[in-house]
Amino acid sequence: MMKMRWLSAAVMLTLYTSSSWAFSIDDVAKQAQSLAGKGYEAPKSNLPSVFRDMKYADYQQIQFNHDKAYWNNLKTPFKLEFYHQGMYFDTPVKINEVTATAVKRIKYSPDYFTFGDVQHDKDTVKDLGFAGFKVLYPINSKDKNDEIVSMLGASYFRVIGAGQVYGLSARGLAIDTALPSGEEFPRFKEFWIERPKPTDKRLTIYALLDSPRATGAYKFVVMPGRDTVVDVQSKIYLRDKVGKLGVAPLTSMFLFGPNQPSPANNYRPELHDSNGLSIHAGNGEWIWRPLNNPKHLAVSSFSMENPQGFGLLQRGRDFSRFEDLDDRYDLRPSAWVTPKGEWGKGSVELVEIPTNDETNDNIVAYWTPDQLPEPGKEMNFKYTITFSRDEDKLHAPDNAWVQQTRRSTGDVKQSNLIRQPDGTIAFVVDFTGAEMKKLPEDTPVTAQTSIGDNGEIVESTVRYNPVTKGWRLVMRVKVKDAKKTTEMRAALVNADQTLSETWSYQLPANE
């Protein structure tokens, strides 16, 4: 009788254990915290030289066999494909599948890939690992799986929604960006991906982050749609003190645009993944910072408490603004970060790096807290990242936003109607918005403007724009020293009512 009771209790315990087992971010956090208490071990490359030294064109020949997509034989709408190691993607990452009862390592096999003309010894690749992975989902049509997430290299990941193409990237963490000591790039060293059910519309991914001075545990919940939203939870532990911690970092590219035209003739009027930094400050102010490709490294810091959101946006999606049939910059998404909870005091920081071509990501934006805990203490950050082409929906409906910033030679119209340059620089800024379009065109809209010590506002005028049903600000400024940057701000008002976001522009140094 006692034996039967013991067996019954054992069976009940087994049933309870199996039904209540669940993998969570806490499992990853235990590993991250343990790593933080140990010395950093740099990842070791196991890559044969034929792959490590290959050119990009050769790396592109290594393709995943779509017929062997992970979960291909399951009814789940999500599928996984993997990246092969090659070039600077020379260290493997571990990838695991999480099911209802267990964690299973997804093992590398060269049979997953076709290698094109890349000559290699099959025995030398049989024990390699994956460089990263991608997620496929029928986001554009029910009968076709399209790539919606790519996790490859350091802590970078790219995400798109319906009708979008890859553009800017997000990252897990940034350390010492733009500091003289040099930037440290943490990397995701291991992933755990939950096997979704047939009816699931979201995919959960966990990641373990490691670097010389920080570790972290991450949970990403990917929700694909017209806008693909990624819900992020992170637990970060410092191994050692850092100069600057970048939370929810975004990385993009800006080469040229109307505010900074191409120095050489180019059939493309604009070339960028993003054209501005948008900030919703803790005090409710909306700020728009047009991007530059400066001649020298530029860092802009916007101090605040408890930010409500920030993002790198691609405003203005008419194909005629880009004219690029190959790279389709008009279809590249904006990324908007919405913090959850109070993030305290800190700054949204924008880093602009000089670049000569579009292959370099030269724009970085992130939140950096004023106070960091001692090494080993846990930091928690929760936020969502929305990848969207509907930039107006990322903005308050009752607040007008900057549709376009154009830079021109300043001039004055003479009595003979000929425009004569007067040594100034003109900025033409168009504001628009749902509520602004409802205003009568004779509304007495004016501009509140200011400029830093290195400049003088010669004239500013505001007039109704019947084409956009918004208002256009024209501001002519005189720069005192072209070797220095010049800061300026402007916002539209009607008496004591603020109508628009704040246009916050930095004119780069000319040399």
UniProtKB/Swiss-Prot annotation:
Pfam families: MdoG. SUPFAM superfamilies: E set domains, Galactose mutarotase-like. GO terms for biological process: beta-glucan biosynthetic process. Residues 1-22 form the signal peptide. It comes from the Bacteria. Pathway: Glycan metabolism; osmoregulated periplasmic glucan (OPG) biosynthesis. Keywords: Periplasm, Signal. Its main location: periplasm. Gene3D superfamilies: 2.70.98.10, Immunoglobulins. GO terms for molecular function: carbohydrate binding; catalytic activity. It is found in: Periplasm. InterPro entries: Gal_mutarotase_sf_dom, GH-type_carb-bd, Glucan_biosyn_MdoG/MdoD, Glucan_biosyn_MdoG_C, Ig-like_fold, Ig_E-set, MdoG_OpgG. Disulfide bonds: none annotated. GO terms for cellular component: outer membrane-bounded periplasmic space. Belongs to the OpgD/OpgG family. Involved in the biosynthesis of osmoregulated periplasmic glucans (OPGs). HAMAP family: MdoG_OpgG. This is Glucans biosynthesis protein G. It comes from Escherichia coli O139:H28 (strain E24377A / ETEC). The gene is mdoG.
